[in-house]
A protein has these predicted regions:
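Structural signature of tandem alpha-helical TPR/SEL1-like repeats
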Residues: 8-10, 37-50, 71-84, 105-118, ...
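Canonical tetratricopeptide repeat
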Residues: 64, 98, 132, 166-167
Length: 173
């Protein structure tokens, strides 16, 4: 009698295949990250843009592209990238938080606060968003709320306490 069970296990070839369909993307992404670390932001932008030519919806590459643009003081392009991410995923907390930083740089603290609150709504455990909320509230002279947000950020990540001591945004707190 023959066993008619279908073989659903992976073959040895499938498990150890040397082909990585994301090899080029991953290589460009890592190179872009290293260029960012070396403060070669224009070159990093080129790497992330190459990734996006192949996959225009690669959110991870878009986040790094926007962050690089932001640090090149190309705020309008950074904002365009973050808006595109939010078109793909309106609940992306990192995009909301980074968008808040662009508004902060433009000294538009109310808009920055609105964006960072959307980041927190998307991920209530996002410590950096809570920290930034504390900064923005401080800049808007809402000291008690600023302290509450800072306290929450420190509960999530204790390193934020050390950071806040040196942060000029908390001078009036």
């Amino acid at each position: 009698m023959k066993d008619n069970k279908k073989n659903t296990s992976l073959s040895k070839k499938d498990e150890t295949s040397l082909t990585n369909v994301n090899y080029q993307r991953d290589r460009l992404f890592k190179k872009g990250i290293n260029l960012m670390a070396d403060e070669k932001l224009e070159e990093a932008v080129e790497n992330f843009e190459m990734i996006l030519r192949a996959d225009p919806n690669d959110v991870e590459a878009m986040l790094k592209l926007g962050y690089s643009r932001f640090h090149l003081d190309d705020h309008s392009e950074a904002m365009r990238v973050y808006d595109k991410i939010l078109d793909i995923d309106v609940t992306n907390p990192e995009a909301w938080n980074l968008k808040s930083l662009v508004n902060y740089e433009k000294k538009n603290y109310a808009k920055a606060l609105d964006c960072v609150e959307k980041a927190i709504d998307s991920d209530p455990t996002y410590g950096m968003a809570w920290y930034n909320k504390g900064c923005y509230l401080s800049m808007l002279n809402q000291v008690p709320d600023s302290l509450e947000a800072l306290k929450r950020s420190i509960e999530i990540d204790v390193k934020n306490a050390r950071k806040a001591v040196k942060d000029k945004d908390f001078v009036n707190v």
